[in-house]
Amino acid sequence: SLYAPSALVLTIGQGDSASAGIQRAVTLSCMPTPSGTHPDARDACAQLRQADGKFDELTATKAGTYCTKEWNPVTVTATGVWEGQRVNYSHTFGNPCMAKAAKSTVFSF
């Protein structure tokens, strides 16, 4: 194959762990072309490539974002393969506002 495989299942759940009640899930494949059930696969793949697959960069909060301090956790996960490497990523945001304030749209679905 000319391309290293990149196929992920992305989830968003309510709660503070990866086993939280999953509310939404999509698939994202980036090679050879962006595809899957992600609503903006092309942009999500471009952001993943730009971050070199470092999901922590994608879940960082945009500068100048203001959210309440309420604890209403939202957990996002990415499981699968990115450029041939196994991925098992999980990140918990303090609340939905913080999740929406992430720098990327990879987990916007």
Curated annotation (Swiss-Prot):
Keywords assigned by UniProt, alphabetized: Disulfide bond, Protease inhibitor, Secreted, Serine protease inhibitor
Residues the record marks as site: Reactive bond: K69, E70
SUPFAM superfamilies documented for this protein: Subtilisin inhibitor
Compartmental location: Secreted
Gene Ontology CC: extracellular region
Cystine pairings recorded for this chain: C30-C45, C67-C97
GO molecular function list: serine-type endopeptidase inhibitor activity
UniProt keyword Secreted, yes or no: yes
Superkingdom, taxonomy of origin: Bacteria
Main location per the UniProt record: secreted
Assigned protein family: Belongs to the protease inhibitor I16 (SSI) family.
Complex formation: Homodimer.
Protein name per its UniProtKB record: Protease inhibitor SIL-V2
Native organism: Streptomyces orinoci (Streptoverticillium orinoci)
